[in-house]
Amino acid sequence: MSVWPRWLAAVVFALGFLAATGASAEVRSLKLYHLHTHEKAEIVYKRNGRYDPEGLRKINIILRDWRRNEPTKMDPRLLDLVWEAYRQSGATDYIQVVCGYRSPATNSMLRSRSRGVAEKSQHMLGKA
Protein backbone atom coordinates (compact mmCIF):
# COMPACT_ATOMS: atom_id res chain seq x y z
CA MET A 1 0.00 0.00 0.00
CA SER A 2 1.39 3.42 -0.91
CA VAL A 3 1.86 6.41 1.38
CA TRP A 4 -0.35 8.59 -0.81
CA PRO A 5 -3.74 7.42 0.55
CA ARG A 6 -2.59 8.00 4.15
CA TRP A 7 -1.29 11.44 3.25
CA LEU A 8 -4.52 12.26 1.42
CA ALA A 9 -6.58 11.01 4.35
CA ALA A 10 -4.53 13.21 6.71
CA VAL A 11 -5.09 16.28 4.50
CA VAL A 12 -8.83 15.61 4.22
CA PHE A 13 -9.04 15.13 8.00
CA ALA A 14 -7.09 18.34 8.67
CA LEU A 15 -9.23 20.37 6.27
CA GLY A 16 -12.41 18.98 7.82
CA PHE A 17 -11.13 19.81 11.29
CA LEU A 18 -10.22 23.35 10.26
CA ALA A 19 -13.62 23.88 8.64
CA ALA A 20 -15.43 22.61 11.73
CA THR A 21 -13.26 24.77 13.99
CA GLY A 22 -13.96 27.84 11.86
CA ALA A 23 -17.71 27.27 12.00
CA SER A 24 -17.68 26.80 15.77
CA ALA A 25 -15.55 29.95 16.21
CA GLU A 26 -18.15 32.03 14.37
CA VAL A 27 -19.51 35.16 16.03
CA ARG A 28 -23.00 36.32 15.07
CA SER A 29 -24.19 39.85 15.71
CA LEU A 30 -27.09 42.02 14.60
CA LYS A 31 -27.05 45.77 14.04
CA LEU A 32 -30.52 46.98 15.06
CA TYR A 33 -32.17 50.39 14.86
CA HIS A 34 -35.70 50.65 16.30
CA LEU A 35 -37.69 53.21 14.31
CA HIS A 36 -40.11 54.01 17.16
CA THR A 37 -37.73 54.20 20.14
CA HIS A 38 -34.65 55.36 18.16
CA GLU A 39 -32.54 52.80 20.02
CA LYS A 40 -29.48 51.64 18.11
CA ALA A 41 -27.20 48.75 19.00
CA GLU A 42 -24.84 46.20 17.53
CA ILE A 43 -25.33 43.06 19.60
CA VAL A 44 -23.39 39.78 19.58
CA TYR A 45 -25.95 37.08 20.28
CA LYS A 46 -24.06 33.90 19.37
CA ARG A 47 -20.45 32.83 19.89
CA ASN A 48 -18.79 29.54 19.03
CA GLY A 49 -22.12 27.95 18.12
CA ARG A 50 -23.77 28.90 21.44
CA TYR A 51 -26.26 31.62 22.15
CA ASP A 52 -24.86 34.40 24.34
CA PRO A 53 -27.32 35.00 27.23
CA GLU A 54 -26.31 38.66 27.63
CA GLY A 55 -26.66 39.31 23.90
CA LEU A 56 -30.08 37.65 23.86
CA ARG A 57 -31.13 39.76 26.85
CA LYS A 58 -30.11 42.96 25.03
CA ILE A 59 -31.99 41.92 21.88
CA ASN A 60 -35.08 41.09 23.96
CA ILE A 61 -34.97 44.62 25.35
CA ILE A 62 -34.59 46.41 22.01
CA LEU A 63 -37.32 44.22 20.42
CA ARG A 64 -39.69 44.64 23.36
CA ASP A 65 -43.30 45.82 23.06
CA TRP A 66 -42.34 49.51 23.10
CA ARG A 67 -45.92 50.65 23.75
CA ARG A 68 -46.03 48.82 27.09
CA ASN A 69 -42.25 48.62 27.70
CA GLU A 70 -42.68 44.85 27.99
CA PRO A 71 -39.91 42.51 26.83
CA THR A 72 -40.20 38.82 26.00
CA LYS A 73 -37.81 36.06 25.01
CA MET A 74 -37.41 36.32 21.25
CA ASP A 75 -37.00 33.02 19.44
CA PRO A 76 -33.24 32.65 18.76
CA ARG A 77 -34.06 30.81 15.51
CA LEU A 78 -35.63 34.06 14.25
CA LEU A 79 -32.37 35.86 15.02
CA ASP A 80 -30.42 33.23 13.08
CA LEU A 81 -32.81 33.62 10.15
CA VAL A 82 -32.41 37.42 10.17
CA TRP A 83 -28.63 37.08 10.52
CA GLU A 84 -28.45 34.68 7.58
CA ALA A 85 -30.58 36.93 5.34
CA TYR A 86 -28.49 39.95 6.38
CA ARG A 87 -25.23 38.11 5.63
CA GLN A 88 -26.39 36.71 2.29
CA SER A 89 -27.66 40.10 1.14
CA GLY A 90 -24.28 41.70 1.81
CA ALA A 91 -25.90 44.38 3.97
CA THR A 92 -23.72 46.42 6.32
CA ASP A 93 -26.10 49.08 7.65
CA TYR A 94 -28.43 48.80 10.64
CA ILE A 95 -31.56 46.68 10.32
CA GLN A 96 -34.55 48.98 10.74
CA VAL A 97 -36.95 47.47 13.26
CA VAL A 98 -40.58 48.50 12.90
CA CYS A 99 -42.03 45.94 15.29
CA GLY A 100 -40.71 43.04 17.35
CA TYR A 101 -42.61 41.55 20.26
CA ARG A 102 -46.23 42.54 20.82
CA SER A 103 -47.99 41.84 24.08
CA PRO A 104 -51.50 40.35 23.77
CA ALA A 105 -52.92 43.72 24.90
CA THR A 106 -51.04 45.63 22.20
CA ASN A 107 -51.94 43.06 19.57
CA SER A 108 -55.61 43.31 20.55
CA MET A 109 -55.49 47.12 20.36
CA LEU A 110 -53.84 47.04 16.92
CA ARG A 111 -56.27 44.37 15.75
CA SER A 112 -59.21 46.59 16.69
CA ARG A 113 -57.76 49.31 14.43
CA SER A 114 -56.68 47.23 11.46
CA ARG A 115 -57.83 44.12 9.64
CA GLY A 116 -54.20 43.30 8.81
CA VAL A 117 -53.29 42.18 12.35
CA ALA A 118 -53.57 38.46 13.04
CA GLU A 119 -55.44 37.34 16.13
CA LYS A 120 -52.67 34.88 16.95
CA SER A 121 -49.80 36.99 15.62
CA GLN A 122 -46.29 35.57 15.57
CA HIS A 123 -45.27 38.88 17.17
CA MET A 124 -46.90 37.69 20.41
CA LEU A 125 -44.71 34.57 20.35
CA GLY A 126 -41.41 36.42 19.82
CA LYS A 127 -41.20 34.98 16.31
CA ALA A 128 -41.66 38.13 14.22
Predicted regions and their residues:
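Bacterial N-terminal signal peptides that target proteins for export
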Residues: 1-9
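Hydrophobic helical h-region of N-terminal Sec-dependent signal peptides
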Residues: 9-18
